[in-house]
């Protein structure tokens, strides 16, 4: 049995050997904490392995006990392995948590979850505490005032430096008007407290009883404005409802009942002084003031009506007494009233005329009062002329008999009084408006004649042909002035006076002349207006007068014709324009019939002509401006094909072509130059440069180039273009004589002359006609000779 048990122990230990190996691997990864545990586990493993080699004969008497001890060691080893694994796992988890990378959103989310507040719950009193009143400072029975600063200093030792004057206005009680200001403040406070409020908190501060059943702290003391209907349902006070004290709110079926609190108002001086007063049940001072106001209006109503009626009657009487006439001249409605006034005026006019002296002290004042009369007559004269308009002819005026001989004086006096009335405001009770029959008539020296036409009856002078014989026989007691002349007839005025005539609708307000918007609008309407872009159709109207046609048909203005005529009459001698210089302003751009033409590129003394490199003809047509293109491949400056060559004009009846030295006939024209080597100047046959004006006008020009300035000094048409690869090439070389004469013109190849130099022949000899090859060899020889002859 013992042997069998030992073998079983061995098999169990062998089965557990893989776990030991895994535990050993884990221990190697653990730091200082698992080192001791690993050592103990290794020792136990050695003990277990030693049991395997124990002989069978020795497994007696305590071997089983040893095996039992070893098995217990194995069990402890397994438990230690679990502990080590747990320790290593926790260490790894801590390291992984520390090494996790988090974003700001994740960190803020964790902070929100950590600092998240708990859900607020509504406080509900316990059932057993429902009848207990809430304690407050107002319920203290002692009369000792509570001082928060003294309490803090007593309990916490904090001494306050609070100064009330820093936060409120300081009251100066020693001011002499302090009592008056206090009474005024008390009155304002009572007025404020007498107003009706829907705020429960304000009502509570005023000492009113508030039924707070069904209301919480938010409803009572919150600053949120609730609807008026909701607040009224919970508000109970003496000012709002007196008969419904026991009425409960309908919105709450079983409100939580609290005992009524004893409300004590704060110790404010404005409230303490009138604490014994209740809310005003009767209408306040506002209602009394309103009653007094309405009573005053009722009493003032009849008085105002009487005053208005009296004023209207006075104006009516005044207008009737001053009535001049209606619009219809056939109905003299005011004849009697005018006659009565006339009789009274005749009695006092002699006295008034005798009293009128230049030294009268009242006269300056009357002149000042008469000044607005002139302006009134000037304004009314224009309207009278428009309405009246010479309705009655002179013949009708002659037919009417003059029944009242004294009408001229009456009309003049009445017009004077009317002018004074119209010049000022209409006030019936004013003394200045009453007719003053004693007023003297102003003399012509003291009365200014108005520049504008005056009314017909008073200020219009009578023409000689309109005067009647009866007028001459009427004696006049008053001196008539030029501006006040009567025609012997009571001609009714068409100007409306007060209530007799219709109000003229032609009167324009004076303020409109000073209206900025009106004036600017009139100027804008009178100015030429251009249609807005959005008001134009998408297609423009085209025609001979349209803007597009006008611009297209326009020509630049200038006296170009006179300039042409002046240039033709006085032709100027053309001068040579050096490179990199401006063209003379007086020189015309094109030759006139009387002006010889000098082609561009005329040889300048000191410079050699630039010869073109031979190139093939291009397909480009000749330039319309007369400038040949680069297709002209010539060894000399010959014109293009199709253009007239420049002809040499001999001066003063000399032969056109000088005789040649060899007697073979005329040589090449002197205008064709033979290229010279070594920078020598090419001249004519006799070695003298041609004179100015020896070129006949032609349609083209010679292609002469300036080698010292390079290709940049040439025009675009003179630059060669290689048609093979499409790129410009600067292959113009002065010393490449073989290329220069390889493609020479047929007209000049037969008559080329050698250039004069120190080693060549004399200029009088002429070279015989040679072929292209001979010419090339000869040119190369001349070039080498020229180079040797250079200093």
From Swiss-Prot:
PANTHER family assigned: ATAXIN 2-RELATED (PTHR12854), ATAXIN-2 HOMOLOG (PTHR12854:SF7)
Name of the protein: Ataxin-2 homolog
Recorded GO CC terms: cell division site; cytoplasmic stress granule; cytosol
GO molecular function: mRNA binding
The protein's role, per its UniProt record: Involved in post-transcriptional regulation of gene expression, probably by association with mkt1.
Origin species: Schizosaccharomyces pombe (strain 972 / ATCC 24843) (Fission yeast)
InterPro entries: ATXN2-like (IPR045117), LsmAD_domain (IPR009604)
Main localization of the protein described in the UniProt heading: cytoplasm
Disruption phenotype: Impaired RNAi-mediated heterochromatin silencing.
